[in-house]
């Protein structure tokens, strides 16, 4: 009878339970409906289900890949994949875009916060080896070495090689997104001081198709002179160069002056690049300095004046043994 009573007290009828059973918790621990077998509540002192496998003890080999080591799951990734920005370690970093000021043409906001530009012409290997004139390319940087713009000449092959440095050209200036923010248009003009009625000129457009200023050559028997004009062709500033536009081992300065030529407010410098580069290539370096508070449109016009000066006095074409002088 005693054995029979123990069997009737077991959780499942007909199951023989040894001495010490039933367990200390009551039968009400079973959860869920009566026809569904559920797990009972664990006894006191139960440590819970086993977690991830612990790490290997000292002296054991490192587990293979895929081994779920100890510690919490979903541990954050420490090294995120890097985005290969066009101006990353493989190239020149771009200047961050500043907030555009009021009444600023799109793309010229970069010029609002700087008072100096560096213009570096790229060396074309085909041009060096064969003398075949290619489209000029320029990097335009700020004083920190960050690229502000990239300029590309857009002139057909026949015009480049037949007209040489006197050629008409279109220069497209791009920002860090590859958008054309400025266009420089130089028409075909006479390059001799003997014809003052047809002197050099370049038009600056920002955005393309909208003129913001002009650079016109002013006739003078000895000095290279230019006038910087606004979009209404009103004179704003002047650029005056040296009598002889050539030197060795030193820079050549074109001073930015007021209209009365009494005060100097900036300059365009053709920088000495070294004997090898000067002798065997036409890749030039220029520095442009202007007042920080100068209107961004006039800063863009000064950039156009730099390119016009480069083509007039420092552009080597074909197999010419020396570059252009002050007057041809």
Curated annotation (Swiss-Prot):
This is Phospholipid scramblase 1. A motif (SH3-binding 1) lies at residues 18-26. It catalyses: a 1,2-diacyl-sn-glycero-3-phosphocholine(in) = a 1,2-diacyl-sn-glycero-3-phosphocholine(out); a 1,2-diacyl-sn-glycero-3-phosphoethanolamine(in) = a 1,2-diacyl-sn-glycero-3-phosphoethanolamine(out); a 1,2-diacyl-sn-glycero-3-phospho-L-serine(in) = a 1,2-diacyl-sn-glycero-3-phospho-L-serine(out). Residues 1-93 are annotated as: Proline-rich domain (PRD). It is an enzyme of class 3 (hydrolase). The record marks 127-128 as: Breakpoint for translocation to form MMTRA1A. Highly expressed in kidney, lung, liver and bone marrow, slightly in spleen, heart and macrophage. Forms homooligomers in the presence of calcium. Interacts with ABL. Interacts with RELT, RELL1 and RELL2. Interacts with OXSR1 in the presence of RELT. Interacts with OCLN, TOP2A and TOP2B. Interacts with TRPC1, TRPC4 and TRPC5. Interacts with ILDR1. Disruption phenotype: Knockout newborn mice display a reduced granulocyte production. Hematopoietic precursor cell from knockout mice display defective colony formation and impaired differentiation to mature granulocytes as stimulated by SCF/KITL and GCSF/CSF3. Deletion mutant mice start to die at 3 days post-infection after influenza H1N1 challenge, and the survival rate drops to 50% at 28 days post-infection showing lower survival rate than WT mice. The keyword Zinc does not apply. Keywords: Calcium, Cell membrane, Chromosomal rearrangement, Cytoplasm, DNA-binding, Hydrolase, Lipid transport, Lipoprotein, Membrane, Nuclease, Nucleus, Palmitate, Phosphoprotein, Repeat, SH3-binding, Transmembrane, Transmembrane helix, Transport. Its cofactor is Ca(2+); Mg(2+); Zn(2+). A motif (SH3-binding 3) lies at residues 93-101. A motif (SH3-binding 2) lies at residues 56-64. The modification Phosphothreonine is found at residue 170. It is linked to Participates in a chromosomal translocation that produces MMTRA1A which is leukemogenic to syngenic SL mice and athymic nude mice.
